[in-house]
Amino acid sequence: MKIFYKAINMTLSMFTVIPLPKYEWDDRAAKHIMKLYPFIGLIIGILWYLSFFVLSKLNVPIMLMAALILTVPYILTGFLHLDGFMDVSDALLSRRDKETKLRILKDSTVGAFSVISVVLLLLVEFAGIFTVLNKNLDMRILIFIPIASRTMNGYFIVSQEMLGQSSLAKFFKEGTGKVDEIILLGIYVLVALITFFTLGINYLIAILAMGLISFILLLKVKKELGGINGDVAGYILVLMEFTGILLLGII
């Protein structure tokens, strides 16, 4: 139980900016981090929904509310995944050979493609959130979207070939196996079912579309880069959540 508590502490510290008591790193607890990744999604999702609830009670104008809601998950995660999205976008959009793409991925310099990509992403995501608010949809979906994205991310990290030898994602994979993969896939199915029974079919379609786009992105990245790492996981997570919001704005 103590190991599990440490794992929760470590997971929250790694993937959020939520202040926590100091702790000592424990390699035995690290193997549980990916299984707890959906829990991080739950925390972020609840805080995301609460931000909407508070803003709506304050009668904040819809356009401003959409902009503020957009920032919440990025702020809570310290822009960790958005940074990965920018790095991978820069590499993939360069249209260079595999070795050059990998070199670009490791380069800390902010490239033009990454800037263009993040600006377009945030503009369209803002429009999506604004549309969802304007359509008066059930905003409890904000709880489920981060859980789904992090569940699939955890599954990819424990099941896929790692990119590079020094990847932190590779460290998280150590000590995991088929049981972890089954648990994470089971959680995704559970999230989909709860979404359907509490919110309805349109919201289920959004969750399933997030899963579909994640596999499409995974295949693309594996083809062009050869595997997955922390940046790739962030890239997939950001586009999964973007897909969920965008689809709700359309259907």
From Swiss-Prot:
Keywords: Cell membrane, Cobalamin biosynthesis, Magnesium, Membrane, Transferase, Transmembrane, Transmembrane helix. InterPro entries: CobS (IPR003805). Pfam families: CobS (PF02654). Its cofactor is Mg(2+). The chain crosses the membrane at residues 36-56, 60-80, 110-130, 181-201, 202-222, 231-251. Its main location: membrane. Pathway: Cofactor biosynthesis; adenosylcobalamin biosynthesis; adenosylcobalamin from cob(II)yrinate a,c-diamide: step 7/7. It comes from the Bacteria. One of its GO terms (molecular function) is adenosylcobinamide-GDP ribazoletransferase activity. The keyword Disulfide bond does not apply. It is a multi-pass membrane protein. The keyword Nucleus does not apply. It is an enzyme of class 2 (transferase). PANTHER family: ADENOSYLCOBINAMIDE-GDP RIBAZOLETRANSFERASE. Belongs to the CobS family. HAMAP family: CobS. Joins adenosylcobinamide-GDP and alpha-ribazole to generate adenosylcobalamin (Ado-cobalamin). Also synthesizes adenosylcobalamin 5'-phosphate from adenosylcobinamide-GDP and alpha-ribazole 5'-phosphate. This is Adenosylcobinamide-GDP ribazoletransferase.
